[in-house]
Amino acid sequence: MTVSNTVDQYTIMSGDRSKIKDLLCNRLTECGWRDEVRLLCRNILVEKNGNNSLSVEQLIAEVTPKARTLVPDAVKKELLMKIRTILAENEGDN
């Protein structure tokens, strides 16, 4: 089992996963990331959907790598610190 899978499994079992997801959603909204991704989707649809052949899966495949690069470093660092704190608290409980 990889470290990523272990962390994922622990956060699900401890109930912290929903807290982390909520924090992520809030931070992405606050920094304007969601609006940027929404605009990116619109632009791709206008550009490539002239013949109505772009599926949702194709849109997701094209947007996902670009959207990931748009996540601010501050948000990534905050989430990483939150996960480390959760894991450290778990270590202290054992």
From Swiss-Prot:
Component of the nuclear pore complex (NPC)-associated AMEX complex (anchoring and mRNA export complex), composed of at least e(y)2 and xmas-2. Component of the SAGA transcription coactivator-HAT complexes, at least composed of Ada2b, e(y)2, Pcaf/Gcn5, Taf10 and Nipped-A/Trrap. Within the SAGA complex, e(y)2, Sgf11, and not/nonstop form an additional subcomplex of SAGA called the DUB module (deubiquitination module). Component of the THO complex, composed of at least e(y)2, HPR1, THO2, THOC5, THOC6 and THOC7. Interacts with e(y)1. Interacts with su(Hw) (via zinc fingers). Keywords: Activator, Chromatin regulator, Cytoplasm, mRNA transport, Nucleus, Protein transport, Transcription, Transcription regulation, Translocation, Transport. GO terms for cellular component: cytoplasm; DUBm complex; nuclear pore; nucleoplasm; SAGA complex; transcription export complex 2. GO terms for biological process: chromatin organization; mRNA export from nucleus; positive regulation of transcription by RNA polymerase II; protein transport; transcription elongation by RNA polymerase II. Belongs to the ENY2 family. Involved in mRNA export coupled transcription activation by association with both the AMEX and the SAGA complexes. The SAGA complex is a multiprotein complex that activates transcription by remodeling chromatin and mediating histone acetylation and deubiquitination. Within the SAGA complex, participates in a subcomplex that specifically deubiquitinates histone H2B. The SAGA complex is recruited to specific gene promoters by activators, where it is required for transcription. Required for nuclear receptor-mediated transactivation. This is Enhancer of yellow 2 transcription factor. Pfam families: EnY2. InterPro entries: TF_ENY2 (IPR018783), TF_EnY2_sf (IPR038212). GO terms for molecular function: chromatin insulator sequence binding; transcription coactivator activity.
